[in-house]
Design a protein with these regions (language model features):
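Single conserved hydrophobic/aromatic residue that forms the stacking wall/gate
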Residues: 1-6, 10
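Acidic/histidine-rich alpha-helical segments that form the ligand environment
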Residues: 11, 15, 19-22, 54-55, ...
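Residue-level signal for short amphipathic helical patches enriched in basic/charged
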Residues: 26-29, 106, 139
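Conserved alpha-helical segments that form or flank metal/cofactor-binding pockets of metalloenzymes
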Residues: 27-67, 129-132
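Generic structural concept
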Residues: 35, 39-42, 46, 86, ...
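Structured surface interface patches that mediate subunit assembly and partner/cofactor docking
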Residues: 131-155
Length: 155
């Protein structure tokens, strides 16, 4: 009964790997702030997978660790990375919305309540990344320098 939540755990692990790959990409290009921000994103995604697994177990299900597909390793530019991130976050939002729809159809109010926390978080994630994209597009290389410093301050 918790197959979809387990699949979301695997998806969050994939997301963690994606952000870690992006962190390494930025570090190799000298963008320490972007690298740090992406590493924090990776930790956040890993935490999401753990939270989902804990929820499945609290509800009597068995959490499982599944295989995670390889993630991209290269991007053309910082703009390309953040465009990828934005598309990815929108996709994650769609997946979470589907989980909420299933929980609603099954009249599983506990799962609906649990998942709404993720829905709210995704609104923030998409807005944050859209803001970064806007700044990169508006300011070019100067914006990259300042954003690198700004995003590096995230703990």
């Amino acid at each position: 009964p918790y197959r979809r939540q387990r699949q979301m755990c695997i998806r969050d692990r994939w997301s963690a790997n994606l952000y870690l790959s992006m962190s390494y990409f930025f570090a190799a290009k000298g963008y320490e702030g972007f690298a740090s921000w992406m590493k924090a994103q990776a930790h956040e995604e890993s935490d999401h997978a753990d939270v989902l697994a804990q929820y499945v177990m609290k509800r009597g299900g068995q959490a499982k660790v599944g295989a995670v597909d390889a993630v991209p390793q290269e991007w053309a530019s910082p703009l390309d990375v953040f465009e990828h991130v934005y598309k990815h976050e929108c996709h994650v939002s769609e997946l979470i919305d589907k989980l909420v729809d299933v929980a609603s159809a099954e009249k599983d109010k506990a799962s609906q309540d649990f998942l709404w926390g993720f829905v709210r978080e995704q609104v923030e994630e998409e807005a944050t990344v859209q803001g970064i994209l806007d700044k990169i597009k508006l300011g070019g290389d100067v914006a990259l320098y300042h954003l690198d410093i700004q995003l590096g301050a995230r703990k």
